[in-house]
């Protein structure tokens, strides 16, 4: 089974459990509203209510936070944009139909931000650290995320992780999905460049640089799975195997869902 198929199955699995638990919560609340004299175990009812409150409070917090931070950082990046370089870069990659913003900052910054209209943000430090070919490899990696709407997909995955983090299947699924997405973005950049040399130089230099400052509400070039990404560079002819380790979390999550179904109908 290819990594792309595995990634899609894992994502579908996350969404399935999220929707299933939400449906059970809805049924339970409907049952509660129709019958105030529930015959079930009182402590289970209280616990179920607490789980519902916790879940939806976390989801709402994430939605508000994402909306606020996304707007905040877009305004911040626009206010610090290097007008001339931004204009040149947008003209150079005009066929991408994607807005690029070059921020005046000596530090390394390369990310994709925005869900409805994703944008690529890079710092002037990127142009100081890397040559033209290496910069293009970085931009191609970010463009992959833009053209595949990965910000929306990762936001949904993060929403599931925040709201349904108590399901054992969610956290490893999000981690696996994010890792494969980064590998696919790297592979796309390599294919477009025709060589792994330029992207490899970027990754190795970033490893030497150490920790990179990150921003919320964005997909970052350096954020995930650097060891797997370097392995893909070193062995481009081989498919990088990312362990899933989802069998036990899947069984535990199924047990939790079954418990909710039994308790909700009692």
Region roles according to the model:
Residues 1-102, 240-243, 258-266:
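Hydrophobic or amphipathic, alpha-helical segments that drive membrane association/targeting
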Residues 1-5, 89-97, 102-104, 183-206:
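Hydrophobic alpha-helical transmembrane segments
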Residues 106-132:
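Active-site scaffold of zinc-dependent metalloenzymes
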Residues 137-140, 144, 187-191, 205, ...:
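Short amphipathic alpha-helical coupling elements at transmembrane boundaries
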Residues 150-174, 178:
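Post-HEXXH active-site segment of zinc metalloproteases
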Residues 218-266:
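Cytosolic-facing loops and C-terminal tails of multi-pass membrane proteins
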